[in-house]
Amino acid sequence: MKMKNPLEPAGRTALEASRELLALEPEEKALALRLMAAGVRSAAEKIVRENGLDMEEARKGGRNAAFLDRLLLTPERVEHMARGMEQVAALPDPVGECIREWTRPNGLHIRQVRVPLGVIGFIYESRGTVTCDAAALCLKSGNAVILRGGSESLRTNRALAEVLRAALKESAVSADAVQLLDSGSRDEVRQLCGLDSFLNVIIPRGGKGLIRAVTEYARVPVLKHLDGVCHVYVDAAADLEMAVNVLDDAKTQRPGVCNAAETLLVDAAAAERFLPMAAERMRLRGVECRVCDRSRPFFGPEAIPAEEEDWSTEYEDLILSVKVVDGVRDAVEHINHYGSHHSDSIITEDE
């Protein structure tokens, strides 16, 4: 006898909410998003307080600096979340947009039109910001969402979900369009992945372990990426002052996020001019550099010789691997071999 999935009630109400969303006008969804943003802004003090309790437990648990940074919500970050939802509200509504159209030789006219998926399962780890991001983007695109955040951010997510659902009750959108699974049980991930009668797609956001578990358990399509081995390539034709500022931002602003730079590639023709600038900036920022033989002369004795595994490592920390390459083709070959195809950049003035 097949066991009943305990999350079926959540799936059923989310499905009903997704059908109601189909009937809403773009302005009704935009208003709901603005109400959600206002609610988050008004509840900032409570959200930060609940997040502080999560932070305290994470510190006691010995979590590293990158993890704590992902978990942390400051008043400024809460305001950033609210503004983000307002920005999503202001975007053109994607539902009903014609992507392309064509006429067949037999006269049949075909249009490819954007439509909502239905119900999205969003599984993530320690970032409370994802609660608002996922809810806003799903609502804007006409989808209901069932959120399952990490147990480390349980209080934070509860506070955020409470605010978002309260805001929806003041709008034309059903509060069941945004639901949070908050038991903290590890079984919830497997159970959510098994809601194939209600979910249309699952989006996991987190580390390799989470992504692999979701991929293994899921009975619906999964939108995923595994790693964030991201590169900055500085070409010989780059504006070097701009390049060092881009590198600084890409590596040091949020080193624990998945789109932070992990490897710097420098054209050999620019190495003598650029690497001293990069070495000094990274030294000032407290970044540990792991360097290839060709780049080592430009770094001090504190630089560490790079090992083979460094080129494919997502550090999630103030660590940067550095390699000199022979032009853009060599750089692209390196990125294709070692990278994760997440977020890579080429800095050049030569189009």
Regions of interest found by a model, annotated:
Residues 5, 126-144, 159, 163, ...:
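ALDH superfamily catalytic-core signature
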Residues 22-23, 236, 324, 347:
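A structural signal for short, well-ordered beta-strand elements
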Residues 90, 98-237, 241:
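Rossmann-like NAD(P) dinucleotide-binding subdomain of oxidoreductase/dehydrogenase enzymes
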Residues 117, 307-351:
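Conserved C-terminal structural/oligomerization subdomain of aldehyde/semialdehyde dehydrogenase
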Residues 1-110:
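N-terminal Rossmann-like NAD(P)+-binding subdomain of aldehyde/semialdehyde dehydrogenases
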Residues 24-30, 95, 171-178, 254-260, ...:
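Flexible, glycine/charged-enriched surface loops at secondary-structure junctions
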